[in-house]
C-alpha cells in the first residue's frame, strides 16, 4: 500500500518569512494538495539565542496571508530534544555512533591541517575506535555518527538528479553536543521520520545536508524520504538575491501593496514552468504542479514582472474586495492611521465608486491608495510642485469660471459634468485638455489622477464646488 504523501515546511524563526521560504512553503503545499496529502509545519527553533516569538508569529502570519494552510498542529523542534537524544543513544548502543573527547584546540588543529592539505574531511576520526577509558575525566564528550569510511552516499533527487558523494570525504558528524543538545542534522532526520514525512522539498543549499542525513537514516534503518532540492532565487543580474533585488520578508511585500494571489502566482513560476502559461488560479496551480517541471538553474527575481502581474490581479479584482484589501493595508503603512481615521461609510462608498478608474492605473495597492488620496484630502488641498506650476493667475481665474459653469449641473454625474465642460471649452475656444488640467489640480492637488469627470462624480457637487472655490482667483 502506498503511503499518503506528507510534505513539511520547516523554517528557522530567526527573522521574517523570507521570500524564498515563501516559495518553498508554496511548493510543499501545492505538491501535497495535488496528491491529496498533507503539508506539515515545523518550527526549527533549536537556536535559542536567535529564535524569537515575534519571528515565529511573522512566519505564521506570512503563511496565512499567502493563503498557505498547513495541516495539524505546528511542531516545535526544541520541544522534541529528549526524543532526539534518545535516537543518539540508540545509535551509540548499536555501535553506530561513538563518544568523541577531542578538545576545541585539537579540533581546530585538525581543521587547519585538513585545509592546508586540501582535504574536505575536517575531523580525523581519532576517537572513532579509541578506548573511552583514555578520555579526560572532566571532559563532556560529543556523540558522533560512525559514518562509512568508503563507498558512496547517493541521493536520487527529483530535481537535481543522481547526486553522489564519496564517503571518504564526509566527516563523522556530531549528533549530540557536549552539553547534550542535539544538532540540527540529527533533529531534522528524527523529526521527519517521526512526522511520517514522505517528501522533503527544500532549497538546494541543503543538498550537502542530504548526504549527511541519509547516513543517519541508513544507520537507523529508516526509509529515506523522496528528496527534491529546488534552485535558489537570484537577482535579475544572476547574483545572490539581496534586499535591493527583493530579498525581503513576505510581510514587506504585503506592506508594498502586493496581493497574496499575485505573489503566489509569481512565486510558483520562479523555477517551475507549465508550458507558456503565466497566470494560474490556485486550483490550476494545484492541478499542474509537478516536481519534474522544476528546473535546476537558479530562478531570477524580476520586480517589473511581479508588478505587472500584480496589476493584472488588481484589474481583475472586484471593487469591493479591493476596498477591503486597502483597509487591511492601512495597518502596514506609515500613513495608514491618518487615512483610517477618515474612513466612513461615505468615503468607503466613494472608494468603491472610484475603483474602476483607480484600478486601471495601479500596479500595487500602495499606488491605488496614493491615487485615491483625493478622496481623503482636507481642504484647502495641499498642491504638489507640478500642480503649483499649473496654477498661474490666469488659470486661477479660469477655475473660477469653471466653477460657475458647474454650479447648475443636475444631476451631478460624470456624464453631465463632462457635457458641461465640453460646452464651456467650445464656447471659450479652448481644447478640453486646457479645461481638464486646471480642474484636476484644483480637485486632487496633482497633475495626474483618475479620469477627471470620474473624480467630479466621486467627490460630489458640494465638495467639488468648495475645492474649486479654494483655488479660484
Curated annotation (Swiss-Prot):
Spell out the GO cellular component terms annotated for this protein, sorted alphabetically and separated by semicolons: cytosol
What is this protein's record name? Glutamate--tRNA ligase
GO process terms (BP): glutamyl-tRNA aminoacylation
On whether Protein biosynthesis is a keyword of this UniProt record, the answer is yes
Instruction: From the Swiss-Prot or TrEMBL record, state where the protein is found.
Output: Cytoplasm
* Locus of motif 'HIGH' region: 11-21
CDD domains, per this entry?
GluRS_core
Show the stretches that span the lipid bilayer: none
Subunit structure of this entry?
Monomer.
Catalysed reaction equations from the record:
tRNA(Glu) + L-glutamate + ATP = L-glutamyl-tRNA(Glu) + AMP + diphosphate
The record's listing under InterPro entries reads:
aa-tRNA-synth_I_cd-bd, aa-tRNA-synth_I_codon-bd_sub2, aa-tRNA-synth_I_CS, aa_tRNA-synth_I_cd-bd_sf, Glu-tRNA-ligase_bac/mito, Glu/Gln-tRNA-synth, Glu/Gln-tRNA-synth_Ib_cat-dom, GluQ/Sye
GO molecular function terms noted in the UniProt entry: ATP binding; glutamate-tRNA ligase activity; tRNA binding; zinc ion binding
Where is the motif 'KMSKS' region annotated in this sequence? Answer: 240-244
What's its EC? Answer: 6.1.1.17
Q: Which UniProt keywords apply?
A: Aminoacyl-tRNA synthetase, ATP-binding, Cytoplasm, Ligase, Nucleotide-binding, Protein biosynthesis
Amino-acid positions noted as binding ATP in the UniProt annotation, renumbered to this chain: 243
Instruction: Please name the Pfam families in this protein's record.
Output: Anticodon_2 (PF19269), tRNA-synt_1c (PF00749)
**Which top EC class is given?**
ligase
SUPFAM superfamilies xrefs: An anticodon-binding domain of class I aminoacyl-tRNA synthetases (SSF48163), Nucleotidylyl transferase (SSF52374)
The record's comment on protein family reads:
Belongs to the class-I aminoacyl-tRNA synthetase family. Glutamate--tRNA ligase type 1 subfamily.
Q: What does this protein do?
A: Catalyzes the attachment of glutamate to tRNA(Glu) in a two-step reaction: glutamate is first activated by ATP to form Glu-AMP and then transferred to the acceptor end of tRNA(Glu).
Major location category of this protein: cytoplasm
Amino acid at each position: 500500500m502506498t503511503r499518503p504523501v506528507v510534505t513539511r515546511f520547516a523554517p528557522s524563526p530567526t527573522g521574517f518569512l523570507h521570500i524564498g521560504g515563501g516559495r518553498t512553503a508554496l511548493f510543499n503545499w501545492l505538491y501535497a494538495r495535488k496528491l491529496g496529502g498533507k503539508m506539515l509545519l515545523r518550527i526549527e527553533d533549536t537556536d535559542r539565542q536567535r529564535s524569537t516569538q515575534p519571528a515565529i508569529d511573522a512566519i505564521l502570519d506570512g503563511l496565512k496571508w499567502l493563503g498557505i494552510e498547513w495541516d495539524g498542529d505546528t511542531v516545535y523542534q526544541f520541544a522534541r530534544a529528549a526524543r532526539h537524544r534518545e535516537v543518539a543513544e540508540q545509535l551509540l548502543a548499536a555501535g553506530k555512533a561513538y563518544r568523541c573527547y577531542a578538545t576545541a584546540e585539537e579540533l581546530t588543529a585538525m581543521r587547519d591541517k585538513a585545509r592546508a592539505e586540501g582535504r574536505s574531511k575536517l575531523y580525523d576520526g581519532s576517537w572513532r575506535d579509541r578506548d573511552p577509558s583514555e578520555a579526560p575525566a572532566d571532559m563532556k564528550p560529543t556523540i558522533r555518527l560512525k559514518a562509512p569510511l568508503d563507498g558512496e552516499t547517493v541521493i536520487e533527487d527529483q530535481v537535481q538528479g543522481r547526486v553522489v558523494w564519496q564517503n571518504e570525504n564526509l566527516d563523522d558528524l556530531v549528533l549530540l553536543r557536549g552539553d547534550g543538545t542535539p544538532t540540527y542534522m540529527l533533529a531534522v532526520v528524527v523529526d521527519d521520520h517521526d512526522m511520517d514525512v514522505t517528501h522533503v522539498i527544500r532549497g538546494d543549499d541543503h543538498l550537502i545536508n542530504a548526504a549527511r542525513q541519509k547516513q543517519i537514516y541508513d544507520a537507523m534503518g529508516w526509509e529515506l524520504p523522496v528528496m527534491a532540492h529546488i534552485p535558489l532565487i537570484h537577482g535579475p543580474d544572476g547574483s545572490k538575491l539581496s534586499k535591493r533585488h527583493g530579498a525581503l520578508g513576505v510581510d514587506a511585500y504585503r506592506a508594498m501593496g502586493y496581493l497574496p494571489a499575485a505573489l503566489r502566482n509569481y512565486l510558483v513560476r520562479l523555477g517551475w514552468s507549465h508550458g507558456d502559461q503565466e497566470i494560474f488560479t490556485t486550483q490550476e496551480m494545484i492541478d499542474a504542479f509537478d516536481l519534474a517541471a522544476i528546473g535546476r538553474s537558479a530562478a531570477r527575481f524580476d520586480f517589473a514582472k511581479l508588478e505587472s502581474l500584480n496589476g493584472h490581479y488588481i484589474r481583475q479584482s472586484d471593487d469591493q474586495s479591493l476596498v477591503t484589501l486597502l483597509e487591511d493595508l492601512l495597518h502596514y503603512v506609515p500613513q495608514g492611521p491618518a487615512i483610517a481615521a477618515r474612513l466612513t461609510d461615505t468615503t468607503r462608498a466613494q472608494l468603491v465608486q472610484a475603483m474602476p478608474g483607480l484600478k486601471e492605473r495601479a500596479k500595487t495597492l500602495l499606488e491605488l491608495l496614493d491615487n485615491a488620496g483625493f478622496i481623503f484630502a482636507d481642504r484647502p488641498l495641499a498642491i504638489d510642485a507640478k500642480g503649483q506650476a499649473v496654477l498661474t493667475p490666469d488659470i486661477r481665474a479660469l477655475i473660477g469660471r469653471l466653477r460657475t459653469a458647474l454650479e447648475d449641473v443636475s444631476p451631478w454625474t460624470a456624464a453631465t459634468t463632462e457635457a458641461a465642460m465640453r460646452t464651456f471649452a467650445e464656447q471659450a475656444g479652448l481644447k478640453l485638455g486646457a479645461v481638464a488640467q486646471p480642474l484636476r489640480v484644483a480637485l486632487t492637488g496633482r497633475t495626474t489622477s483618475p479620469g477627471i469627470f470620474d473624480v467630479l462624480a466621486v467627490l460630489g457637487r458640494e465638495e467639488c464646488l468648495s475645492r474649486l472655490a479654494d483655488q479660484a482667483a
